[in-house]
Amino acid sequence: SLTAKSKSIVKAFWGKIGSRADDIGAEAFGRMLTVYPETKTYFASWSDLSPGSAAVKKHGKTIMGGIAEAVGHIDDLTGGLASLSELHAFKLRVDPANFKILAHNLIVVLALFFPADFTPEVHMAVDKFFQNVASALSEKYR
């Protein structure tokens, strides 16, 4: 679980993301689809899965909205993300291993967008947070 200090670091860092959230989401999602092409199977109905496409940008924004929701529920991720977990488990049927793949890509992009702010301490707190988010999203699979 996250320590009080890690929660504080995540909240403070997330506060810096602000207007860049949509770009971060689009870049991370596009990167995931490129680096891990097997993840494209969940989006087979989309006509354009290339980085920067309208669909990728739109879903990147959706992802970042979910992460912002998680930051808001940082003290109860399982409860706060229950509906997202249910959606991904029962309707979308996403393999929960993909949450960790997306988390990795988000970390890479956050480091690229905020090189001065993404210190080892921030990296550690954000990584733990994303692992907790992945676990909470996997809850309905159990």
From Swiss-Prot:
Top-rank taxon, per record: Eukaryota
Presence of the UniProt keyword Chaperone in the record: no
Q: What InterPro entries is this protein classified in?
A: Globin, Globin-like_sf, Globin/Proto, Hemoglobin_a-typ, Hemoglobin_oxygen_transport, Hemoglobin_pi
Q: Where does heme b bind?
A: 88
Question: What is the tissue localization of expression for this protein?
Answer: Red blood cells.
| Keywords in alphabetical order | Acetylation, Heme, Iron, Metal-binding, Oxygen transport, Transport
Q: Name one GO molecular function term.
A: oxygen binding
Q: Which PROSITE patterns match?
A: GLOBIN
Q: What is this protein called?
A: Hemoglobin subunit alpha
Which source organism?
A: Electrophorus electricus (Electric eel)
